[in-house]
Swiss-Prot record:
Disulfide bonds: C69-C74
Pfam families noted in UniProt: Gla (PF00594)
Stored PANTHER family: COAGULATION FACTOR, TRANSMEMBRANE GAMMA-CARBOXYGLUTAMIC ACID PROTEIN 4
Chief localization: endoplasmic reticulum
Primary role: May control axon guidance across the CNS. Prevents the delivery of ROBO1 at the cell surface and down-regulates its expression.
Organism, as annotated: Homo sapiens
Keyword NADP set for record: no
Lipid bilayer topology: Single-pass type I membrane protein
Keywords in alphabetical order: Cell membrane, Cleavage on pair of basic residues, Disulfide bond, Gamma-carboxyglutamic acid, Membrane, Phosphoprotein, Signal, Transmembrane, Transmembrane helix
Residue ranges the record assigns to the propeptide: 18-49
Gene assigned in the entry: PRRG4
Protein name (Swiss-Prot/TrEMBL): Transmembrane gamma-carboxyglutamic acid protein 4
Family membership noted in the UniProt record: Belongs to the commissureless family.
Cellular compartments annotated: Endoplasmic reticulum-Golgi intermediate compartment membrane; Cell membrane
């Protein structure tokens, strides 16, 4: 409730603070003439112009009067930095604050966005370099495969070597195949010594244990009777 009373007490002060809002009947007659403007002024106001300070670095591009105050709105400090002289700054600021920014006769001409153009060209160049490197790598890989076609064939042939060897009859008669280990069985002690050429090898030790109860049976081979 107290807040509402405070707001109601502030209404007269607010109405006195905006005297231009109260228009008389005479001022309402010329309201249409003040609101609408000509076609040329409207087109000039809505027309898009490329500013010099758009998309570039002001550290490398020094500012001047055309850039700071004509192409854009500047303040007194920026104007003083441009003119350096206090008298010239005051004279310019009096005219600038009254008339606003003014453009030259050639100010309406379209400007070229140099930085945007350079950015597009640099991006296109980077893409071309990347695609060129990829194409070079693919060409080198393909050429290496064409120059060495035997390596893969030898590798495949080594993997799939047949285990069955076919020989001609005369070769088999001259050099018969050695018997396999499964057919020949285990070699005897003398054969093992002869194969390894280790004659100094002592015979295996006797079996530890009692041999009195064992008998040696000799099998005699007899020819069958006719």
């Amino acid at each position: 409730m107290f807040t509402l009373l405070v707001l109601l007490s502030q209404l007269p002060t607010v109405t006195l603070g905006f005297p231009h809002c109260a228009r008389g009947p005479k001022a309402s007659k010329h309201a249409g003439e003040e609101v609408f403007t000509s076609k040329e002024e409207a087109n000039f106001f809505i027309h898009r112009r490329l500013l010099y300070n758009r998309f570039d670095l002001e550290l490398f591009t020094p500012g001047n009067l055309e850039r700071e105050c004509n192409e854009e709105l500047c303040n007194y400090e920026e104007a003083r930095e441009i003119f350096v002289d206090e008298d010239k700054t005051i004279a310019f600021w009096q005219e600038y604050s009254a008339k606003g920014p003014t453009t030259k006769s050639d100010g309406n001409r379209e400007k070229i966005d140099v930085m945007g153009l350079l950015t597009g060209l640099i991006a296109a160049g980077v893409f071309l370099v990347i695609f060129g490197l990829l194409g070079y790598y693919l060409c080198i890989t393909k050429c290496n495969r064409l120059q060495h076609p035997c390596s893969s064939a030898v590798y495949e042939r080594g993997r799939h070597t047949p285990s069955i060897i076919f020989r001609r009859p005369e070769e088999a008669a001259l050099s018969p195949l050695p018997p396999s280990v499964e057919d020949a069985g285990l070699p005897s002690y003398e054969q093992a010594v002869a194969l390894t050429r280790k004659h100094s090898v002592s015979p295996p030790p006797p079996y530890p244990g009692h041999t009195k109860g064992f008998r040696v049976f000799k099998k005699s081979m007899s020819l069958p009777s006719h």
